Regions:
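Cytosolic, membrane-interface loops and tails of multi-pass inner-membrane proteins
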Residues: 55-63, 126-144, 148
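Alpha-helical transmembrane segments of multi-pass membrane proteins
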Residues: 4-21, 44-50
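Terminal transmembrane helical module of multi-pass membrane proteins
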Residues: 135-199
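Conserved phosphate-binding loops in nucleotide/dinucleotide-binding enzymes
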Residues: 19-40, 135-154
Length: 200
């Protein structure tokens, strides 16, 4: 909840300084810009909290709760970081800290860090309805779930690390293409990994 409150606080502080004549002419546009991402963070929190309460698949699996909430928290921190960066870019603060020059790279680096942070937790997950490779087999076979998500965790951390480095050393357009290619490759590897373990 602290992350959510901070997001709304940052939006409220930046609200009067968000510029643009088009924004002034569009009723509610300034509020949408200032509070859309904090609202998204709140929705993420409420949605996954509801899924946890109504998840019958993970019944009796209390050890997974800390990992579940850690993944949600890291996702929320990423959204908050994006929001804070956006507010910096849209207000006069950008002239002080120079977000025009490094802002886009920071977005890619933040994405890489978030993917690594979440991927590091995937091997600790257990069958649930919220996230992961959710098929009839993985949801009913904890051993299969663990095998698939162990590989998925390694892949996700590696993907995040490459994205992080790409954000630092590669141009923005090239980084976007590389990220897309790596995501497709990771999904393909996960598909064949699942098929391999499921048919074993």
């Amino acid at each position: 909840m602290v992350v959510i409150a901070l997001g709304f606080l940052v939006g409220a502080l930046a609200y009067p300084f968000i510029p643009g004549h088009a924004i002034d002419q569009m009723r509610g546009a300034r509020a949408q810009i200032a509070f859309s991402l904090p609202l998204t963070t709140l929705i993420i929190y409420l949605l996954f909290r509801s899924l946890w309460r109504h998840d019958r698949v993970r019944s009796g699996n209390g050890a997974f709760e800390a990992t579940y909430h850690a993944i949600i928290f890291r996702t929320m921190v990423f959204v908050f970081g994006m929001h804070a960066l956006l507010m910096l870019a849209l207000t006069d603060v950008m002239d002080v800290v120079g977000t025009h020059t490094w802002g886009k790279r920071v977005v890619v680096v933040m994405l890489g860090l978030a993917i690594m942070a979440i991927g590091n937790l995937l091997p600790r997950t257990r069958p649930n309805i919220a996230f992961g490779v959710r098929t009839a087999r993985t949801l009913t076979n904890p051993q299969l779930w663990q095998k698939v998500h162990r590989v998925g965790g390694y892949l996700t951390v590696a993907l995040g690390a490459i994205i992080l480095v790409a954000g630092i050393v590669i141009t923005n357009n090239a980084a976007a293409g590389l990220v897309l290619l790596l995501v497709v490759l990771a999904v393909a590897i996960m598909f064949f990994t699942y098929r391999r373990y499921a048919s074993a």
